[in-house]
Amino acid sequence: MKIETGQGTIPLITLLGIWSISALNALPGLAVSPILGQMSTIFPHSSEFDIQLLSSLPSLLTIPFILLSGKLTERINNIVLLQVGLIIFALSGLLYMLSSRMWQLIAVSALLGIGSGMIVPLSTGLISRHFIGRYRTRQFGLSSAITNITLVTATVLTGYLAEINWHLPFIVYFFPVVSFFLSFYLKRDTISVAPVKVTVSGKIEVKRLVSLMLFYGLVTYLAVIVSFNLPFLMKEYHFDTGASGIIISLFYLAIMAPGFILNRVLSIFGSFTKCVSLLCMAGGMVLILLSGNELILSLIHISEPTRL
């Protein structure tokens, strides 16, 4: 089966490889999210800072390694760099399973952030390389949806696995093994992809670029603080890790939905799309503060996020 790209076609297996890389963007810090509220019980001598560091360190280290990865692509083959990142990612999953102390978990979280940082820019780069025009826009929307489908599925899974043993949620970090094998098809197909000549007129609008970066940073921050702090809120409401996992997954399920109809959403709201997104998120957060019921929290998290 061949997939239309706007500049030819690619095999379905190549597209699956690209999608599998997009799915990995959701994983860093995910496994510990449902059990953050229990970490003080598992490790009674750990401070609140240690627990927060465990969940935020992967994202923190992802940032500099995204920049480094972008620079390395100028000298190193993209697919080779991707495979190195996947190996580091999967290795961190194995080390998580073997860790029994908080400092070990924190150290492995740093390693996870390094692997994730090497992968993230390449996941979007692969879409940009293979697709153009409306096909590219559609794939970016699907990529976002796939990322959040992974979040939904993995969060529910980790929530229930945490009730069996706190080590088991880290199984989700072995998913890069699948992407590693699919990356060989990417390597084979990349050779045949012809570069696209793009004519750019005028200069880059720096102010617009900065405003988009700030907006994306704000929306990402608002989404992250919900997923990171919800387990502690659930603990205060005396809910178990399974319920925490379900509600976090509903949050990402709602984020996922617009990705399937991104072009349609943009055509309806136009320049007001970002305003609508922020209003939905603000309304959801206000309702979270006012609610202590599990069912109501679930409904709030379905209606809250509209990250486009």
Predicted regions and their residues:
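Extracytoplasmic gate region of multi-pass secondary transporters
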Residues: L209-I248
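Paired small-residue
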Residues: S92, W103-L111, I296-I300
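Conserved MFS/SLC helix-loop-helix module at the cytosolic interface between two early adjacent transmembrane helices
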Residues: P64-S100
